[in-house]
Amino acid sequence: MASYPCHQHASAFDQAARSRGHSNRRTALRPRRQQEATEVRLEQKMPTLLRVYIDGPHGMGKTTTTQLLVALGSRDDIVYVPEPMTYWQVLGASETIANIYTTQHRLDQGEISAGDAAVVMTSAQITMGMPYAVTDAVLAPHIGGEAGSSHAPPPALTLIFDRHPIAALLCYPAARYLMGSMTPQAVLAFVALIPPTLPGTNIVLGALPEDRHIDRLAKRQRPGERLDLAMLAAIRRVYGLLANTVRYLQGGGSWREDWGQLSGTAVPPQGAEPQSNAGPRPHIGDTLFTLFRAPELLAPNGDLYNVFAWALDVLAKRLRPMHVFILDYDQSPAGCRDALLQLTSGMVQTHVTTPGSIPTICDLARMFAREMGEAN
């Protein structure tokens, strides 16, 4: 084959240009990498923050346990962020919780259609989720990288939240879907709105035998709440699936690769107590993904429509980084408090991003508590 000098010269020129280009890129990257390294070193000198989200089905004893834990610390080093009851009942809408339970009851009694119930439930869940999502967004600029948990000094501040945004944007919508009062499309719409998971997101789920759970729920008094055993079973089921889903994802599970292992359409599996990270990776059929093999979400060829598949990608991305812990609530309030305190020693702290972040976060948390913490 003939050799063409012009091609040889072009090749040599291209090679030289590529070499210079690589050199220029390396030179350009050096200051950026040096800046990033400097930023990391500066961040590592910042105070640390521990964020703990106490979550799980209602009625286990989360609020009592949390308040007992907060009472152990001083006002300056531990701050409680309560559930936004005033927003739910007054600021965001009127009597949201009563509206939810009444709507479910009317659906169960055949007084309204599933479609009518879904409209009310979807609107109500938007109200339930808004305070969590916006608070997460306000805190996000102050959250730096993870500082680790082993041999870490005590954090400058511990924030104890009554629930994470996924409670209102994933778990309760999914439970209402199991109850027939929300569509799977609406559940995935909420999933798409889950904020990106911040570093150091420690979520505490609960374990409690069902009979003990029913007993505790029957004894508590919450505005607008009804004792709905079917809903209790549904939300317990969803939180069990949530714990499994995090384990599945952190164990390398891919819903896209394993989707074919789900047969037929969604059949909600029986509930089980949430499990810790120990043990083998759960099967995809024991995760939240199984709920979304629903006819409404499938194209004629049996595959998920792309828009719903993308929502499941968002779900996987949001859940994978979470640090999940399981608290045994089948003990006295003081025992629960001590067990929670023990769990915090293994939780992941984060550095804050500025010298003023800690007092700013304290102010934000206290403003939230004053404005939304209790119904007026």
From Swiss-Prot:
Q: How can this protein be applied?
A: Used in molecular biology as a selectable marker to identify transfected eukaryotic cells. Used in cancer suicide gene therapy to selectively kill transformed cells.
Gene Ontology BP annotations: DNA biosynthetic process; TMP biosynthetic process
Q: Does the keyword Protein transport apply?
A: no
Record's subunit section? Homodimer.
Task: Give the protein family.
Answer: Belongs to the herpesviridae thymidine kinase family.
Carries keyword S-adenosyl-L-methionine?
Answer: no
Q: Which UniProt keywords apply?
A: ATP-binding, DNA synthesis, Early protein, Kinase, Nucleotide-binding, Transferase
Q: Where is the active site?
A: 83
Q: HAMAP family annotated for this entry?
A: HSV_KITH (MF_04029)
What mutagenesis or variant effect is reported for residue 175 to T? In mutant KG111
Where do the annotations place ATP binding? 56-63, 216
Q: Where is this region: Disordered?
A: 1-39, 260-280
Q: Which residues bind substrate?
A: 101, 125, 222
State the superkingdom.
Answer: Viruses
- Protein name as it appears in the record: Thymidine kinase
Query: Which Pfam families does the UniProt entry name for this protein?
Result: Herpes_TK (PF00693)
Q: What does this protein do?
A: Catalyzes the transfer of the gamma-phospho group of ATP to thymidine to generate dTMP in the salvage pathway of pyrimidine synthesis. The dTMP serves as a substrate for DNA polymerase during viral DNA replication. Allows the virus to be reactivated and to grow in non-proliferative cells lacking a high concentration of phosphorylated nucleic acid precursors.
Record gene name = TK
According to UniProt, the reaction catalysed is: thymidine + ATP = dTMP + ADP + H(+)
The EC number(s) attached to this protein equal 2.7.1.21
Q: Which GO terms describe its molecular function?
A: ATP binding; thymidine kinase activity
Q: Tell me what else is known.
A: Phosphorylates and thereby activates certain drugs like acyclovir (ACV), valacyclovir, and famciclovir to a toxic form, that leads to successful suppression of the infection, while the uninfected cell does not have this ability because it lacks TK. Mutations in thymidine kinase may induce HSV resistance to antiviral therapies in immunocompromised patients. The most frequently observed resistant strains are unable to express TK and are avirulent in animal models of disease.
